[in-house]
Amino acid sequence: MANLNHIGIYVKNLEKSLEFYDELFGFKVVNSFTSGEAKISMIDIGGGTLELVQRPGSPAAPPDGNWSHVALHDPKFDETVAKLDEKGIPKRLVPMGNGSSLCFFSDLDGHVIEIMEKDF
């Protein structure tokens, strides 16, 4: 069976995006390289990789609505929600029937991130 290798998203500022994901989740760079004019960093998101691509002239979040979100199980859910509050990042908390919550917010480039208190 095939498995997920990585999810790639465009960002406006690679360095700021790397800092954002490191400060919130502790995600670390596992590889960085260039491809033509694009600067690319791969970050370990625990069980997969998120590819951040900074390419001159490319929009960050897709304007056509074909992109939904990336969902992450976060064992430090409450801590991360508190960090979002500290940074003034707007969020939407959604209570689940299993006694846990989901939290939706946007990264620096408008990509929607969902954090899950418990796995499904």
Regions picked out by a protein language model, each given a short descriptive name:
Residues M1-E15, S68-L72, D119:
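N-terminal beta-strand motif that seeds the catalytic metal site of vicinal oxygen chelate
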Residues A2, I9-L50:
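Core segments of cupin and vicinal oxygen chelate
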Residues N5, A38-K39, S68, G99-S101:
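Residue-level marker for the onset of beta-strands and adjacent loop->beta junctions
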Residues V30, M42, V81-F120:
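Vicinal oxygen chelate
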